[in-house]
Every structure is written in C-alpha cells, then in structure tokens.
Regions:
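Conserved acidic, metal-coordinating active-site core of Asp-based
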Residues: 1-114
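Mg2+-dependent phosphoryl-transfer enzymes with acidic/Ser/Thr/Gly-rich catalytic loops
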Residues: 85-169
Length: 169
C-alpha cells in the first residue's frame, strides 16, 4: 500500500519504520524520525509530503486524479514513478529558478533547465532553454524546447552542455 513521509529542514518524519523507509533512506542517507502519533508532526515545519508506492504506480495515479478534482492550497506532482509529492502552492522548481536568477542578477533567457519528471515542468517552462531527458514521458517532453537523445544515466546533461554551452560559444 501507499506510505507517506513528511519533510522538514533536517530530514523527514514518518509514522512507522518499514522497508520503504529503509529503501528511501538508503538512496540518500537523509535522517528521519519515527513519530509516535500523527499529532507530533505539528512540532516540525513541514515543507513537503511525499506519498510512496514502489509497487503500484496506478495507486498513486488514482490519488493524483482524486486530488486534481479538488481545490487544495498546494501543488502536487510526481517526482519519480514511485513518489507523488505535495508542497505549498508556488513552491516549485520554476519558482526556485526565478528567485535564483534575480538573486544572481542574470537574465532568465541565459538559463538552461534539465528535467525528466512532473516536478521539473515548472522549471523547464521558466528557463531560457527548457530541456527534457529522452526518458521523460511524452507529456513532460511536450513542455521542453529540446529533448536529449541520451538519458541522465548516459551523459544526457553532458549532451545539453555540449550543445548549448560549448558549441554555442
């Protein structure tokens, strides 16, 4: 079944430790706390909730479809085939790159963003050049200015750097 984790500045919290917790921890060694009850979550400044199902993406898609029918004060999207995330409205990668270019004093037209999942769409659309990896689903690729011929495990980002940075000079 589905499992959830709530993220705060120092890691994530969950209601039970199980194989999903351990698998997620093994990916990034992010510290976590097992809560004794759901009310304890109020002690943390949560910035994201992730619903995980490593075995049944269809369950996550049903959740996405149900959420889409409602008016909630948050954005939701897939960040991988197994992770469906919720965060406050407007806290996304597109907002992040917009803030960063202002902070650094550079023009948005001079940026490149590369992504492969729903959580990358806002960034791909915001960047001067939005790139989708070839292994991204077609609906993600539709938002991009360019689609790589290689995926992220086979030098896809290097392909982007060569085409838009090295060869452009």
């Amino acid at each position: 079944g589905v499992y959830f984790q709530a993220f705060y500045d120092d890691g994530f919290c969950c209601l039970m430790e199980n194989e999903i917790t351990k698998k997620y921890y093994a990916m990034g060694q992010e510290p976590y706390i097992v809560l004794q009850n759901a009310k304890e979550i109020d002690a943390y400044k949560i910035y994201k909730v992730m619903v995980i199902d490593y075995e049944n993406r269809a369950a996550l898609e049903r959740l996405r479809d149900a959420v889409a029918k409602e008016q909630f004060p948050f954005d939701s999207f897939f960040s991988s085939p197994w992770f469906y995330e919720f965060c406050p409205k407007g806290q996304n990668k597109g907002a992040g790159i917009t803030w960063l270019v202002k902070h650094l004093g550079i023009a948005m037209k001079d940026t490149i963003a590369v992504g492969d999942e729903e959580n990358d769409v806002s960034m791909i659309e915001a960047a001067g050049i939005g790139v989708a990896m070839c292994n991204a689903r077609k609906e993600i690729q539709a938002h991009a200015d360019f689609v790589t011929t290689r995926d992220h495990n086979h030098s896809g980002v290097a392909e982007v750097a060569k085409k838009f940075v090295l060869e452009a000079q």
